[in-house]
Amino acid sequence: MRAQPAASHFVDGRPLEDAAGAPIPVIHPANGEEIARLHEATPAVIEAALASGARAQKDWAALRPVERARILRRASDLIRARNEELSILETLDTGKPLQETLVADWPSGADALEFFAGLAPAVTGETVPLGQDFVYTIREPLGLCVGIGAWNYPSQIACWKAAPALALGNAMVFKPSEVTPLGALKLAEILIEAGLPPGLFNVVQGRGAVGAALVSDSRVAKVSLTGSVPTGRRVYAAAAEGVRHVTMELGGKSPLIVFDDADLESAIGAAMLGNFYSSGQICSNGTRVFVQKGIKEAFLARLAERADAIQMGDPLDPEVQMGPLVSPAQLEKVLSYIEKARAEGGRLVCGGEASVSPGCYVQPTVFADVTDGMTLAREEVFGPVMAVLDFETEEEVIARANATDFGLAAGVFTADLTRAHRVVAQLQAGTCWINAYNLTPVEAPFGGVKMSGVGRENGRAAVEHYTQVKSVYVGMGPVDAPY
């Protein structure tokens, strides 16, 4: 099945091709077939995207917020009306099963556009009384923003970054991952159809050099990245050269803590969602599952039973529950972590093998008897590999859960809500769940601490990261100067 777009890039309101750029083959992970071939952005394409964005942004910012909101709301409606065809494209691009993409990818993007459309007219300043004088504040857009996406949720990420940027009066040049480049082009088309003026959301394709060129350009006021910690470090350093605003959502090695009074089926379901959904390729996954000793074996037995029942296969089959990893390179990486876990003494409970050939499939895999020092407990795998660790006391598990450089997410399962709140208050994570896991509604802020990132996406908190405050002092009387 082919999914060739009209052109590799979308700049100034139209598809744009420049075949001089290095080729980017788009491979369907389920069978290894090339479904499209794009080209990397040349310097001319990058310049056109930045120039048109900078030019269009000023008029866009001058519109009433409600006028901007109408366009984003129309785009949200268009996405929902076309969700099935967009979800099929997302499945072809990523390998995620259709039963996931129909509910979790473009629908979340539509939610973001709708949410920020509703929020935009309510973003106002404040008045500070100072006797007869006063100060008022204005929230102003930052200007030209750069968004850099990841390959695991390409279309959702594009929407999560574009929605607040555009709603608040900014322009954005977006570079999707070269592994999954197709969804962002569809978003650009839909925004234009909804009435967005040309130049405000441009899409350019490419690898790291293209991202570096965007981030280092003097016209760029803000960078929003979703990616790995090494990429984040490089982008952060480049943005710092120009003292640019930065939001980063990076990796994680998140703890999911299950106390012995938890509802076992719910806790197991959450652990599976937090390790096997999207074939485990989710940054916030709870890949360190801490289970209190008294229920560990019962937890593992039922977990293995449910994991073995997961239906793998063609992701376009609506009955399939788990698809392939995104690429052969990711498959090789995940299999290497499985071998390390075996070598370091992990007890394989289920899975552990490549599965369903051709394609980049790995069975849902669970290791028990994992200790804090093992590679599987320290490094982000980004695949369907769960590490189960046991614990005895609340104090112990809090200390061990926090003993990581990451701090993206955490979860707690217990029937004792007092304990749940007490534990969550001590966990070093930007996003926490109690008796739930990996639910990320756009109404709530999302982001990490420590090496997992800076800033927040979604919720009202995103306003802080796409606007700047101007203070205006108003003197109501004569100026009293001492000279």
Swiss-Prot record:
Q: Which InterPro entries match?
A: Ald_DH/histidinol_DH, Ald_DH_C, Ald_DH_CS_CYS, Ald_DH_CS_GLU, Ald_DH_N, Aldehyde_DH_dom, BADH
Q: Which residues carry this modification: Cysteine sulfenic acid (-SOH)?
A: C283
Metal-binding in keyword set: yes
Give the metabolic or biological pathway. Amine and polyamine biosynthesis; betaine biosynthesis via choline pathway; betaine from betaine aldehyde: step 1/1
| Gene Ontology terms, MF aspect | betaine-aldehyde dehydrogenase (NAD+) activity; metal ion binding
The UniProt keywords, alphabetically, are:
Metal-binding, NAD, NADP, Oxidation, Oxidoreductase, Potassium
Name a biological process GO annotation. glycine betaine biosynthetic process from choline
Sites binding NAD(+) sit at: G149, A150, W151, K175, P176, S177, E178, S228, V229, P230, T231, G251, C283, E380
> Can you tell me where the transmembrane regions are?
none
Positions that bind K(+) 2: V243, K450, G453
Gene3D superfamilies in alphabetical order:
Aldehyde Dehydrogenase, Chain A, domain 1 (3.40.605.10), Aldehyde Dehydrogenase, Chain A, domain 2 (3.40.309.10)
Q: Which reaction does it catalyse?
A: betaine aldehyde + NAD(+) + H2O = glycine betaine + NADH + 2 H(+)
Q: What is this protein's function per UniProt?
A: Involved in the biosynthesis of the osmoprotectant glycine betaine. Catalyzes the irreversible oxidation of betaine aldehyde to the corresponding acid.
Give the matching HAMAP family: BADH
Quaternary structure note = Dimer of dimers.
Q: What is this protein called?
A: Betaine aldehyde dehydrogenase
Q: Which gene specifies this protein's sequence?
A: betB
